Amino acid sequence: MLSFCPSCNNMLLITSGDSGVYTLACRSCPYEFPIEGIEIYDRKKLPRKEVDDVLGGGWDNVDQTKTQCPNYDTCGGESAYFFQLQIRSADEPMTTFYKCVNCGHRWKEN
């Protein structure tokens, strides 16, 4: 629900005062409207899991293949862990995900 200031017509924002009472306050003028009898919910962003967490840290249990790391100039890696997933439609080829054994760099091939 959007509310606007009756004095200057700017949007009112929810703020909490020192007493713990929530108010709708205008940033442009001193207008404040106390909020009573309404529950206020706060949205929080949850951290996303890394690919290692999704696999349960099981990169060591997946197959290895000889392939050159895209960061070969810096790490010299010539083997990588890999697994395949069907992430597109069934008539498309599977996507192969790689992780370099030396530096841990991850990449994929369609």
UniProtKB/Swiss-Prot annotation:
InterPro entries: DNA-dir_RNA_pol-M_15_CS, Rpa12/Rpb9/Rpc10/TFS, Zn_ribbon_RPB9, Zn_ribbon_RPC11_C, Znf_TFIIS
One protein family per Pfam: Zn_ribbon_TFIIS
GO term, biological process aspect, one: transcription initiation at RNA polymerase III promoter
Source organism (scientific name): Saccharomyces cerevisiae (strain ATCC 204508 / S288c)
Database matches in SMART domains: RPOL9 (SM00661), ZnF_C2C2 (SM00440)
Gene3D superfamilies assigned to the protein according to its UniProt record, in alphabetical order: 2.20.25.10
Assembly behavior: Component of the RNA polymerase III (Pol III) complex consisting of 17 subunits.
Family note: Belongs to the archaeal RpoM/eukaryotic RPA12/RPB9/RPC11 RNA polymerase family.
Name of the protein in its database record: DNA-directed RNA polymerase III subunit RPC10
Entry binding sites for Zn(2+) 2: C69, C75, C100, C103
